[in-house]
């Protein structure tokens, strides 16, 4: 599994949730088709008259998520930018997504503007396995942001975190250690630790 594989999952799902922020700072979400995926880039389009277009132009920050039939979720957060050579990109999008011709027949397609996300963070989360599995990737060589929890050297070795963990992903040791690929990020371990030895990663 890598970043391109995750983007390909979003393409296979196709109808995914895109979230942006409006002019009042409020979150807005809608279902948008992933039109193309290649070389670490995700492509989509929207019409110039839509609020979605205005929000992308004003801010560019977007969050994308979808889940397939295997209960595998992919989440992408990054900045979307509008592409030049609009007609060329829209023609290619329509060629690879022919159902779009029924929605925007003829030259009406050119009310659409193509966008690309080629930067940001990707999270893969598989609920279809036991234990669950998660992984993190980034686009454009950005550093991967760590999430979840870590057990520090303040651990007293009582084992309470391991016994309470719903995925049993905490191994005994000095200190105890969380298997990050199987962690739910629920925070139960941090709440039950009597030594306050468990902290959020990256803090």
Feature roles, as predicted:
Residues 112-114, 123-164, 168:
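Ferredoxin-type iron-sulfur electron-transfer modules and their immediate structural context
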Residues 32-36:
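A short, well-structured catalytic beta-strand-centered motif of the EAL phosphodiesterase domain
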Residues 45-47, 67:
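Short His-Asn-centered micro-motif
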Residues 39-43:
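Short active-site oxyanion
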